[in-house]
């Protein structure tokens, strides 16, 4: 006997939850902000390319036009931007920036129109290249550009 009938059944919500974790939707985003800065440069680039962007693709294929994604996308965009402004560590700042940018993509998926879905896809494609470039900056060079990022008693 199924738990529920129709498009809003248990399987729908479990699949949505799994993809939302992968997309780092705001209540489920903590793994991204902790994992990206701590990984190696190569690891961060691969994480940036193959986690959130694949999740956005899955959202496009499965959940296009789902209204609640609009609100989660707007929340992600605002949350990521606000926390990026307050962050002192450059790689964590870039991680919050990724949360913010994925929020724009999720909001586009929630709209569900052809133009919004094309925009979300193009945004995911272009942000993956921008993330590659920005996450490839070694930590040693970040201290030259962002001097208040230096730990006390240590010079970069």
State what each model feature region is:
Residues 1-156:
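Hydrophobic transmembrane alpha-helices and their helix-loop junctions in integral membrane proteins
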């Amino acid at each position: 006997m199924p738990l529920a009938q129709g498009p809003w059944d248990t399987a729908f919500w479990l699949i949505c939850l799994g993809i939302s974790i992968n997309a780092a939707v705001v209540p489920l985003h903590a793994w991204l902000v902790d994992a990206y800065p701590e990984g190696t440069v190569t690891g961060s680039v691969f994480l940036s390319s193959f986690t959130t962007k694949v999740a956005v693709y899955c959202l496009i294929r499965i959940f296009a036009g789902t209204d609640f994604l609009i609100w989660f996308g707007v929340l992600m965009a605002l949350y990521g931007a606000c926390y990026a402004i307050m962050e002192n560590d450059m790689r964590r700042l870039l991680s919050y920036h990724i949360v913010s940018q994925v929020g724009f993509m999720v909001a586009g998926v929630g709209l569900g129109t052809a133009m919004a879905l094309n925009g979300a896809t193009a945004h995911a494609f272009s942000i993956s290249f921008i993330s590659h470039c920005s996450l490839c900056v070694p930590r040693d060079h970040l201290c030259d550009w962002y001097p208040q990022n230096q730990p006390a008693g240590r010079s970069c």
